[in-house]
């Protein structure tokens, strides 16, 4: 893994960007939704599961879920506190649990669906690149900043 910015540098950039955090989250959520639609190949009859953490990464996922619903996608959102060990069948999983804010080990739920990670797959330490627990294996990762 080659770091472009450390998590601390990204927090500094976000805090000093001059853009309200709600605007940044809305922009990120829209970009996540657009990437998800591309990965799905459309919206008709599709089911997406969003795994949403407590912080801004989780908010990115929740905002993406609103955009996807507006496009007709069936969306199920699981908060980090109610995440099952085995995910129901779906067409895509959006991993918005931790992002760069991982502080402890993470055991990902199992899924056969492709995974879109927001910032970095949950369970991977953004500073060291090391696995912390059992991370989700992302098919694609979308990140923002710089």
Residue locations for each model-derived region?
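Positively charged, low-complexity intrinsically disordered leader regions
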Residues: 1-45
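Glycine-rich phosphate/dinucleotide-binding loop and adjoining beta-alpha-beta core of small-molecule
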Residues: 1-5, 41-146
């Amino acid at each position: 893994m080659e770091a472009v910015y450390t998590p601390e540098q990204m927090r500094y950039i976000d805090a000093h960007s001059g853009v309200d955090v709600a605007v940044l989250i809305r922009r990120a959520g829209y970009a996540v939704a657009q990437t998800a639609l591309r990965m799905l190949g459309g919206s008709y009859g599709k089911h997406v599961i969003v795994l949403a953490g407590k912080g801004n990464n989780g908010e990115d996922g929740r905002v993406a879920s609103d955009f996807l619903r507006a496009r007709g996608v069936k969306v199920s959102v699981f908060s980090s506190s109610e995440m099952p060990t085995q995910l129901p069948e779906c067409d895509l999983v959006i991993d918005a649990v931790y992002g760069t804010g991982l502080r402890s080990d993470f055991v990902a739920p199992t899924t056969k669906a492709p995974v879109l990670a927001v910032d970095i797959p949950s369970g991977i330490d953004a500073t060291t690149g090391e696995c912390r627990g059992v991370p989700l294996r992302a098919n694609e990762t979308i990140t923002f900043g710089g």
